[in-house]
């Protein structure tokens, strides 16, 4: 069952919009606890189950899920099961921005804290200009998960519907092909005697995947890798692919030198709506600020 099949099922079988929204929120909770890009999440609450919701108004005023990371940061998450051609307008995001700006007591430490990230999950990628303007340069930062990101997630959606999550809900992993195995073997032998080298492969032969497997082999699935790319879009594509195919979870620290990266540049191929916006780092930006 594909993600599109799930959407069709929700839309055709739900009695009300609220019923459809509730099913979607529960599915997104399971997805966040399964997709390897979010492996640093230790807990994801439905809004009604979040212990500190009273500090944020109690009622459902824009936040659908709350997630906690390994580092103790909290994310405010909104889930919208829209039609694919729907356009998100500013009123739709205003209450989410307002509620996620408030402070609350950390359920673990009982200390006053605030959200470190905002995440907006929706089944449409269309944003109105006023809504687009409203989410720029926000603190905490605003990150988007769109339809394409959900469709390309390496999870088995049927297993999520059946109640499984985590590694049990992942699609079967890739296996290296013969030409990739030869490249991996050659790289392993080469780096026994050299500090640097170059691997040249044709388009469509799996360079990103082969590079991942070479890195895992050289580092024995632990250590640090410096991965440099010339554009934001390649950063997003590469890290998404590595997270999906890695043997062990990857903790990525994404650093961008492009001053335009925080703005939407319509004429730039590296549009900030690219899925790189969805990649989360460990340590968190908040922890990195503390260490300065």
Residue ranges and their predicted role:
Residues 120-171:
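Domain-level recognition of nuclease-like catalytic cores that cleave nucleotide substrates
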Residues 194-213:
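Walker A/P-loop
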Residues 208-221, 241:
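Walker A/P-loop NTP-binding motif
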Residues 252-282:
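Inter-Walker segment of RecA-like/P-loop motor cores
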Residues 280-292:
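Single conserved hydrophobic/aromatic residue that forms the stacking wall/gate
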């Amino acid at each position: 069952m594909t993600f599109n099949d799930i959407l069709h099922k929700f839309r055709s079988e739900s009695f009300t919009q609220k019923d459809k929204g509730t099913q979607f929120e529960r599915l997104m909770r399971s997805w966040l606890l399964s997709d390897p890009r979010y492996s640093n999440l230790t807990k994801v609450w439905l809004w009604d189950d979040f212990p500190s919701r009273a500090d944020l108004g109690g009622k459902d005023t824009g936040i659908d899920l709350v997630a906690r990371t390994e580092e103790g940061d909290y994310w405010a998450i909104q889930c919208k099961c829209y039609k694919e051609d729907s356009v998100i307008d500013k009123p739709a995001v205003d209450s989410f921005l307002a509620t996620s700006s408030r402070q609350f007591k950390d359920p673990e430490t009982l200390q006053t804290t605030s959200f470190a990230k905002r995440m907006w999950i929706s089944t449409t990628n269309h944003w109105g200009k006023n809504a687009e303007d409203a989410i720029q340069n926000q603190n905490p930062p605003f990150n988007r998960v769109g339809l394409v990101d959900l469709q390309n997630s390496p999870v088995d959606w049927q297993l999520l519907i059946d109640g499984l999550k985590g590694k049990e809900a992942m699609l079967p992993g890739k296996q290296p092909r013969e030409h990739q195995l030869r490249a991996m073997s050659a790289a392993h032998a080469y780096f026994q005697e050299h500090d640097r080298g170059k691997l040249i492969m044709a388009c469509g032969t799996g360079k990103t995947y082969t590079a991942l497997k070479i890195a895992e082999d050289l580092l024995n699935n632990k250590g640090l890798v410096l991965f440099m790319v010339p554009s934001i879009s390649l950063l997003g594509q590469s890290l998404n692919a590595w997270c999906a195919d890695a043997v062990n979870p990857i903790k990525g620290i994404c650093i961008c030198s492009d001053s335009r990266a925080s703005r939407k540049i319509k004429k730039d191929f590296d549009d900030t709506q690219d899925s790189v916006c969805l990649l989360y780092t460990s340590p968190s930006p908040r922890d990195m600020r503390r260490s300065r």
